[in-house]
């Protein structure tokens, strides 16, 4: 990630400040300089706040970032533009605050944009989703970003000197190693659950084994004392329990069969005697009922005689019933005939009355015809009364509108003539303006070129002076280098390789004697005295090292000076200051002002003419519009006059109200007449139809009455003849016979019931006599008591059988459950054995006494130390390297850092380093950590890094080494920014971001050295 721009509003000491990081070249090192409290670190806070909504350090809260000098209505906001993976993004984050006059905070705001086709497109507009988007985009969270992007004051010294526990919390955050500890906890929890599960299974086996029934057998009871872990013995004893249970069950089933046979015999005897007792009682009851039935014989004989009489007089009764019906019909016909005669008379009278009413209506026929003609002629006007009324009302309004339009029309004509006079002798000229513009551009270009040339000449002179100074320094350094090389050449290098070989030579001397052959040169040894001055050799060797070190340093300085001279030559070539004719800038400026004045005057004339033309065009448009309006209004007036004249000519009224009253009256007269005439005609037709129907009914009634009288006479003759044959003397006797005939069905039913019951009793009594014949009745109570005793005995036996069967089945089920649990238990123990071992190893019960998480963190720490040592070796002149302390303890060991000193060839505690050495180690560790986190965070590349303070503890030489390290960083493509008060840095670093403060507000500005 590389910063491009940042805009801070009401953020710390910055009320409204913009920093353009694009002024920093791709691989340039720059310094952030300013007084204490001016807001240097706040720049980092703004970047981290824009990305993650928090400050660059944990100690600062969001509320601490808002400027104390911000007004009460403006929010604190940061707009941050940056580039990552060749994509450009812009973030606008606004902090919540309590606006002046309110009591609740405003909502936080976050908008994230991406640059697509030179336009920013919105990607996220919600705070939570936006925060997740940033983490996914950068691949690091806020804590990791703090460690990668900013090296804050004292943070890495603290990390360097911290113990394993403190380092664990930091590394855990950076490398998300909690997941490894979660794995350990999950595995441990799984092991605990599995152990509980195994214990539960043994408990289940024990409970099931204790529930096994022994059938009160002492031998089986002894088997139940086996422990739940003795599963093999349990399985071997299962068949003995089942065999003994089946043996007991068989003995009880044999006893049951014997009792069942005895019970069946008793039940059969009891059933036979119960049936005999019931049949005896039933025979006695049937005989009593049969005797009672015989007592009704006389009543039945009387009913039979009445039935015979009804059957013999059947024809006579039919004649009598028909005669009574005909007489009733005759009386009804006589009554209807008299009523019809009365109705005929009433209809004749009503018809005469309606005929007179119709004659009266015909006298108004001519009057109604005239009304109808008027209504037809003026119906269209009556239907458009509102329109006619509106025409009367609109006519004077339109006449007044026409008068007003003529007046305004004349005014516009006058105004147009006045404008035409004013526009005389005034013309637009855009060509001359273009000419003036072109001349002005040329003059400005000449002036700018002259001023630039003047500045370049001054800069060129300064570069010449700087170049001359650096050439002198270069000459001086080369002379020093030649002197050092000459000194090294003059030192006698003979025997220099024997340095540090004194002990080896003494060992050889102690093993040799005079006269022996030398193992190195092969010559005879004549003397064992001191032939080599080891102290002199060591002094020469140290002197060569010092000269070589000084030589390397001078060469580095020569390279830096040559680089600076090359840079100055490059800048001279860019300036290319050739001697040119100098222009009079003041004279050129006067010409420019004169041309601007002429251009402004012509532009004013053009604007005035355009204004006149615009007004004239508006007036012409208005005149044309007035012509259209007048034509439209006159047309409307003509239409209204035609409509009013037509109305008055046809209606013969000049008043709409009078016409409406007369038209309504005429319409009502016509409607009333038509209604009365139609109503009268309909009534006459109705009465004539009723009269015809009534006369036709009278004819039919007369015919029916004659026919009925004739039929009555014939029936009376037939009845007299039938009465003589049957011996009936009067109609009353016939009526009594007819009444008795109505009871015929009931009489027949009673006779049939009697005969049926009589026959049924005879058959049942004979059947029962056969059933009880020759049989002796036993004592039923004694039989019942014997059956109850036998049933109780059978129930007890069945209960014993059911209990034993249940116990056998229950034992079998429990045996199967125990077998299944044992099988599951065996399978689980095979699988979980390795998991139990793995859980103990991950929990720290291993040779290294390390948990899984600490083992992973040690791996990351060693990678960090490896990266850090590459820089620390350079900064310390190959003297120091960081090493991990490999002490063994439980859980949190292995994260302490020691330093290895190659001068003493020993490791020592990190706190033994001086302040400058501690800074070197901290810086190297910070850079190493940054690189490792980038490697582990999905390949995210941070193209920038900021270092906050720490250089004040360094001496001049160490400071130079630290700066060289940072220069190597920026040469790898990173933009590196440093916050420091050290004055040497201001001289060494070519680009400075100055932060200035006026007690309440700060400002920033890039400045080049």
Curated annotation (Swiss-Prot):
Similarity-based family: Belongs to the SMC family. SbcC subfamily.
Entry keyword annotation includes ATP-binding: yes
Coiled coil: 397-499
PANTHER family: ABC TRANSPORTER ABCH.3
Job of this protein: SbcCD cleaves DNA hairpin structures. These structures can inhibit DNA replication and are intermediates in certain DNA recombination reactions. The complex acts as a 3'->5' double strand exonuclease that can open hairpins. It also has a 5' single-strand endonuclease activity.
InterPro entries per record: P-loop_NTPase (IPR027417), Rad50/SbcC_AAA (IPR038729), SbcCD_Nuclease_C (IPR053380)
UniProt-annotated binding residues for ATP: 34-41
Keywords: ATP-binding, Coiled coil, DNA recombination, DNA replication, Endonuclease, Exonuclease, Hydrolase, Nuclease, Nucleotide-binding
One Gene Ontology MF term: exonuclease activity
One Pfam entry name: SbcC_Walker_B
Protein name: Nuclease SbcCD subunit C
Subunit details: Heterodimer of SbcC and SbcD.
GO biological process, one term: DNA recombination
Top-level lineage group: Bacteria
């Amino acid at each position: 990630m590389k910063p491009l721009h940042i805009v801070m509003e009401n953020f710390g000491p910055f009320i409204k400040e913009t920093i353009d990081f694009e002024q920093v070249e791709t691989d340039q090192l720059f310094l952030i300089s300013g007084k204490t409290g001016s807001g240097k670190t706040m720049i980092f806070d703004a970047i981290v706040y824009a990305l993650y909504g928090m400050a660059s350090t944990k100690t600062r809260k969001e509320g601490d970032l808002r400027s104390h000098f911000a007004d009460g209505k403006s929010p604190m906001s940061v707009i941050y533009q940056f580039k990552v993976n060749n994509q450009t993004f812009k973030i606008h984050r606004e902090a919540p605050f309590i606006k002046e006059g309110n009591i609740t905070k405003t909502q936080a705001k976050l908008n994230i944009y991406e640059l697509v086709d030179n336009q920013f497109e919105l990607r996220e507009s919600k705070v939570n989703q936006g925060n997740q988007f940033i983490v996914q985009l950068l691949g690091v969270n806020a804590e990791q970003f703090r460690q990668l992007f900013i090296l804050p004051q004292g943070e890495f010294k603290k990390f360097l000197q911290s113990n394993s526990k403190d380092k664990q919390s930091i590394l855990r955050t950076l490398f998300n190693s909690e997941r490894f500890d979660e794995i350990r906890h999950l595995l441990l929890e799984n092991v605990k659950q599995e152990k509980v599960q195994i214990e539960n299974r043994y408990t289940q086996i024990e409970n099931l084994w204790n529930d096994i029934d022994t059938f009160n057998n002492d031998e089986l009871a002894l088997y139940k004392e086996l422990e739940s872990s003795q599963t093999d013995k349990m399985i071997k004893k299962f068949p003995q329990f089942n065999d003994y249970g089946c043996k007991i069950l068989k003995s009880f089933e044999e006893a049951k069969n014997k009792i069942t046979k005895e019970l069946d015999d008793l039940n059969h005897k009891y059933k036979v005697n119960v049936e005999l007792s019931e049949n005896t009682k039933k025979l006695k009851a049937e005989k009593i009922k049969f005797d009672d039935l015989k007592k009704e014989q006389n009543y039945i004989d009387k009913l039979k005689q009445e039935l015979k009489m009804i059957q013999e007089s059947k024809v006579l009764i039919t004649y009598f019933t028909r005669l009574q019906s005909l007489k009733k019909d005759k009386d009804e016909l006589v009554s209807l005939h008299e009523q019809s005669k009365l109705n005929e008379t009433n209809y004749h009278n009503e018809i005469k009355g309606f005929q007179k009413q119709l004659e009266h209506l015909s006298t108004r026929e001519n009057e109604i015809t005239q009304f109808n003609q008027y209504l037809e002629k003026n119906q269209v006007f009556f239907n458009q009364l509102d329109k006619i009324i509106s025409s009367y009302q609109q006519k004077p309004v339109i006449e007044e509108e026409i008068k007003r339009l003529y007046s305004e029309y004349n005014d516009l004509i006058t105004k147009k003539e006045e404008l035409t006079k004013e526009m005389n002798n005034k013309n637009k000229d855009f060509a001359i303006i273009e000419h003036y513009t072109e001349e002005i551009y040329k003059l400005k270009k000449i002036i700018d070129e002259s001023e630039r040339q003047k500045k370049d000449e001054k800069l060129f002179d300064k570069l010449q002076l700087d170049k001359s100074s650096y050439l002198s320094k270069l000459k001086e350094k080369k002379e020093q280098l030649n002197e050092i090389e000459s000194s090294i050449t003059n030192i006698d290098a003979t025997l220099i390789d024997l340095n540090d070989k004194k002990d080896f030579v003494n060992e050889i001397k102690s093993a040799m004697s005079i006269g022996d052959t030398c193992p190195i040169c092969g010559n005879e040894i004549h003397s064992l005295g001191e032939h080599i001055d080891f102290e002199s050799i060591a002094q020469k060797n140290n002197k060569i090292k010092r000269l070589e070190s000084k030589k390397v340093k001078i060469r580095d300085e020569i390279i830096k000076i040559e680089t600076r001279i090359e840079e100055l030559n490059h800048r001279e070539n860019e300036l290319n200051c050739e001697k040119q004719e100098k222009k009079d800038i003041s004279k050129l400026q006067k010409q420019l002002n004169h041309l601007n004045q002429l251009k402004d005057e012509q532009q004013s004339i053009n604007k005035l003419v355009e204004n006149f033309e615009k007004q004239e065009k508006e007036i012409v448009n208005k005149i044309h519009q007035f012509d259209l309006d007048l034509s439209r209004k006159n047309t409307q007036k003509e239409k209204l006059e035609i409509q009013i004249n037509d109305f008055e000519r046809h209606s013969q009224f000049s008043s709409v109200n009078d016409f409406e009253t007369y038209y309504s009256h005429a319409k009502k007269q016509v409607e009333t007449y038509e209604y009365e005439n139609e109503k009268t005609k309909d009534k006459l037709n109705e009465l004539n139809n009723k009269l015809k129907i009534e006369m036709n009914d009278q004819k039919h009634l007369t015919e029916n009455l004659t026919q009925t009288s004739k039929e009555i006479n014939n029936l009376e003759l037939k009845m007299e003849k039938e009465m003589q044959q049957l011996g009936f003397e009067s109609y009353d006797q016939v009526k009594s016979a007819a009444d008795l005939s109505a009871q015929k069905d009931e009489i027949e039913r009673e006779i049939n019931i009697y005969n049926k019951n009589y026959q049924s009793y005879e058959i049942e009594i004979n059947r029962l006599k056969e059933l009880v014949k020759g049989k002796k009745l036993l004592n039923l109570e004694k039989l019942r008591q014997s059956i109850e005793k036998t049933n109780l005995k059978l129930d007890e036996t069945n209960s014993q059988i059911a209990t034993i069967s249940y116990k056998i089945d229950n034992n079998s089920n429990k045996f199967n459950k125990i077998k299944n649990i044992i099988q599951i238990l065996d399978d689980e123990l095979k699988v979980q054995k390795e998991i139990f071992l793995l859980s103990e190893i991950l929990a720290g019960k291993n040779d290294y006494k390390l948990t899984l998480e600490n083992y992973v963190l040690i791996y990351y720490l060693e990678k960090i130390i490896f990266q850090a040592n590459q820089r620390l070796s350079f900064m310390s002149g190959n003297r120091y390297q960081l090493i991990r302390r490999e002490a063994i303890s439980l859980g949190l060991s292995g994260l302490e850092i020691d330093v290895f000193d190659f001068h003493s060839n020993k490791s020592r505690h990190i706190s033994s380093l001086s302040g400058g050495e501690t800074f070197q180690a901290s810086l190297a560790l910070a850079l190493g950590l940054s690189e490792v986190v980038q490697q582990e965070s999905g390949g995210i590349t941070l193209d920038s890094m900021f270092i906050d303070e720490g250089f004040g503890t360094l001496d001049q030489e160490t400071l130079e080494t630290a700066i060289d390290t940072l220069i190597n960083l920026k040469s790898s493509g990173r933009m590196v920014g440093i916050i420091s008060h050290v004055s040497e840095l201001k001289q060494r670093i070519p680009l400075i971001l100055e932060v200035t403060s006026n007690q309440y507000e700060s400002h920033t500005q890039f400045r080049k050295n």
